[in-house]
Amino acid sequence: MSVVNNRVALTNLVSMEALTTEEVLGLINRGSEYKAGKVVISDHQKDLVANLFFENSTRTHKSFEVAEKKLGLTVLDFNADASAVNKGESLYDTVLTMSALGTDICVIRHPEDDYYKELVESPTITASIVNGGDGSGQHPSQCLLDLLTIYEEFGHFEGLKIAIAGDLTHSRVAKSNMQILKRLGAELYFYGPEEWYSEAFNAYGTYIAIDQIIKELDVLMLLRVQHERHDGHQSFSKEGYHQAFGLTQERYQQLKDSAIIMHPAPVNRDVEIADSLVEAPKARIVSQMANGVFVRMAIIEAILNGRNKNS
């Protein structure tokens, strides 16, 4: 792995922990350069990429596809429901097949935590792996677009007061962000239902009631309540959660003028955030979506750089 003039070279991208700080900042800056139209795009038509999504996705799946097409890659169609997965084929054998067919990059989302370990350790699979989200584990590309959004606003991370709020235990976004934001010098706070909080998070920040910290925050990062990962016995109604933990109009008014609101989406309106605030002046939710394309262009480019370096 290396970085020269924001041009990062990676073999795979599976977690934020695997990246150096230099690589993280290089990917953010490269995404910013793509956004500003400062990059001359090479011809990548000979490079093949497959987006293997085994969980539903709109933003991650489609922004990777847009990024790949903007870079000129050949994007292979893959529909899990119409593939041999329905005949019992394993993820490993699916990726082994795609690699054997000459696929250079597999972008994968899968419900199993750490699914990627056997893929990147395989002596036979030559395709590079980009983690588009693994269960409740990691979501590196979402984290990088979040970092770009914060950096665009403040120009730094050191000393920023950032609260990550909501369904912390089940959120791969929270885990990726807390790891790297702590490393970059941000001051982290967590809030949400106690049963959705792990003591392991104490290594990164402080668990606190939202109303104790909201006036001091620079960034409020809301998380989706992940109903699909719960057992159906959570004790909160939609209205009850919103009043106890959500961003209500009253809490919005207490934020600093310079504060920003973030959410990885999809948004449960009137649960994590009041419906009227999704596109409010302090909200950067749409900006996050847009930044996803440029960061993912930087990621795909970095993987191609790594493959060319190692070939």
From Swiss-Prot:
UniProt feature coiled coil, ranges: none
Annotated residues for binding of L-aspartate: 87, 172, 224
One GO location term (cellular component): cytosol
Signal peptide start-end: none
Keywords carried by this UniProt record: Pyrimidine biosynthesis, Transferase
Residues noted as binding carbamoyl phosphate in the record, renumbered to the chain: 59-60, 109, 139, 142, 265-266
Pathway of action: Pyrimidine metabolism; UMP biosynthesis via de novo pathway; (S)-dihydroorotate from bicarbonate: step 2/3
Recorded GO MF terms: amino acid binding; aspartate carbamoyltransferase activity
GO annotation terms (biological process): 'de novo' pyrimidine nucleobase biosynthetic process; 'de novo' UMP biosynthetic process; amino acid metabolic process
E.C. number: 2.1.3.2
Complex formation: Heterododecamer (2C3:3R2) of six catalytic PyrB chains organized as two trimers (C3), and six regulatory PyrI chains organized as three dimers (R2).
Similarity remark: Belongs to the aspartate/ornithine carbamoyltransferase superfamily. ATCase family.
NCBIfam families membership: asp_carb_tr, PRK00856.1
Name recorded for this polypeptide: Aspartate carbamoyltransferase catalytic subunit
Gene that produces this protein: pyrB
